[in-house]
A protein has these predicted regions:
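Carbohydrate-interacting/catalytic domains
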Residues: 1-187
Length: 187
């Protein structure tokens, strides 16, 4: 929906603010993706907390409720030419019983960039929730069904893409599973 550059269309009842619902058929993939993002946000209270995040460890859990990152974990880049941004939502501040942490990575550059991921507790793994650069699944995997990152330390984010990762205690990357199996065989 274009507003032809008008940022104050909320107060206009004319073709500038009218929505053409017939465009939904033509843009059904985008419409489905946005519906999934809205549903995902509603199902995780970390993305709609009752109080604004404090960006500090006010519960003495070892991590802040929300932290900002750049291409390097824990090192945000706020200069005007930076085009990469990450945000870590600590699950321990969630009101949900699952206490799942999330990491969002925004690459606004026209080239792919590698992001360092915040470390998770032992036995937990980062799993992809959605990736706007992934066309095969319309960018969104059913919750808990996304690929587990093989490299839990860093991830390549595509050009002009947004990715969301969730902490998953149920799955481990293949390397970790092989290492555990190797230790059992050695015993």
């Amino acid at each position: 929906n274009t507003q032809y550059g008008n940022n104050n269309a909320y107060c206009q009842d004319n073709e500038i603010s009218w929505l053409n619902w017939g465009l939904i058929r033509r843009n059904k993939d985008l419409f489905a993706f946005v519906k999934q993002v809205i549903s995902f946000r509603k199902s995780h209270d970390l993305f709609h907390m009752a109080k604004e995040p404090r960006l500090m460890d006010y519960r003495r859990l070892g991590l802040p409720d929300l932290s900002y990152h750049g291409e390097k974990a824990w090192q945000p880049e706020f200069d005007r030419c930076s085009r990469q941004f990450g945000a870590f939502y600590c699950g321990d501040y969630s009101e949900d019983t699952e206490k799942t942490s999330f990491y969002t990575a925004y690459n606004m550059h026209w080239e792919p960039h590698e992001f360092a991921l915040p470390n998770l507790p032992k036995g937990r793994a980062w799993q992809m929730v959605f990736n706007t650069a992934e066309d095969s699944v319309n960018g969104f995997w059913p919750e808990g069904k996304g690929p587990v990152l093989k490299d839990q330390k860093k991830v390549m984010i595509g050009a002009r893409a947004v990715c969301v990762f969730m902490e998953n205690p149920e799955v481990l990357p293949e390397k970790t599973v092989r290492e555990k199996e190797g230790k059992k065989d050695a015993q």
